[in-house]
């Protein structure tokens, strides 16, 4: 059993049959690209596994959605990883940094992902359109994420923000939200 399999089993995260194959290829590509381009702080295979588990964990509580947008995808956390585990959802990964967007495009092509689209621009430059799910990890505070995501929300859209313990300081003015606590993470789920 690989480290990733063990971590997923410990958190009772069940994924589709292709997830582990995609994750393995992704890890190999990330390790290779990261040496040259410094795409993420996760440097070792174990750290990358932790990032993958952190990114995919919300599939344990997310309802099925048709469309999703990830703001500030970086090296693929969480958007690319969620796309591996949610093959029926079309993901738009928004990443303005050219080196990271190039990596995401390469992963999409190398893995033959049909449910991923990469936008190499800032989210503020995207044409407004509604998404069922909007995600973000390590980009900015909740209020700014609410402003950035506003043109892309519709009634019933879900917002999923990957937060730390300070999330409780950011929700005082919110209603219609849940905080799901898992290992080393607080997932803020807001219904608009």
Model-predicted segments: where are they?
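Class I SAM-dependent transferase core
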Residues: 2-65, 69, 99-102, 106-116
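Residue-level preference for alpha-helix termini and adjacent loops
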Residues: 14, 38-39, 76, 125, ...
